[in-house]
Amino acid sequence: MNEINRSPDLEMVVLKEISSAIVNERNGTALLRHILDVLYRRMKMLRGTFTIRRGNDLMIEASHGLDEQEMKRGHYHVGEGITGHVAETGRPHVIEDISRDSRFLNRTRTRKSGEKVAFICVPIIHLQQVIGTLSIDRAVDRDTDLERDQKLLEIVGNIVGDALAASLQAHEERAALVAENEKLRELLTTNPGELIGNCSTMLQVYDCLLYTSPSPRD
């Protein structure tokens, strides 16, 4: 159950908790999940996602209220739907009722038909570049102030830019390492001479690798 804080100090409470998480959490993705948990407890957030930009694509990096399959479906092109539009323009967007807006794609398929909730999406900017988005589905009642919520999310997006950038860099470094390892493995398998030459020590290492490698029947 959301522990909604109705006081005028809502923003300060949220930002204090998020700032504490940034100081104490070193894992980028875990930090993003922690931030979404804060928004859930404090803002009547039903679902929330951080997307990360890779080239012309946006992929969900962290979420609250989505399962693994729903996260995998949350794949957008820059410029596509509300999330893609925010990533393309660098400007926030608010939909007061997603059931009445045809631009809302519901790509994750988490929203029920006719479900009346608001959707707020803000860009995450690092070094003047949009590197991702933060979006939430929010229940709406007579006390809801969507403009206030948007401004708060923009502040959150600004202060987590470094964390999302670090997560993006880690993804890129892992991908580069995997590609390099695959290239090295292919060379060792198909043309070891290019790497080993006539060095007797390297020849011994290569013989050891071949000896310990599993056979195709294993």
Where are these regions (language model features)?
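Signal-transmission linkers at sensory-effector interfaces
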Residues: 1-30, 41, 61-62, 176-186
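Acidic/proline- and glycine-rich, intrinsically disordered low-complexity segments
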Residues: 69-93
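Conserved ASCE P-loop NTPase core motifs with emphasis on AAA+ ATPases
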Residues: 164-195
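AAA+ ATPase active-site-proximal loops
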Residues: 32, 185-218
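Signal-transducing coupling segments at domain and membrane junctions
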Residues: 59, 68-70, 96-118
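Amphipathic alpha-helical "output/dimerization" segments
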Residues: 14, 126, 144-163
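A short, aliphatic-rich beta-strand micro-motif
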Residues: 117-125
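Regulatory loop-to-helix N-cap segments in sensory/regulatory domains
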Residues: 2-7, 138-154
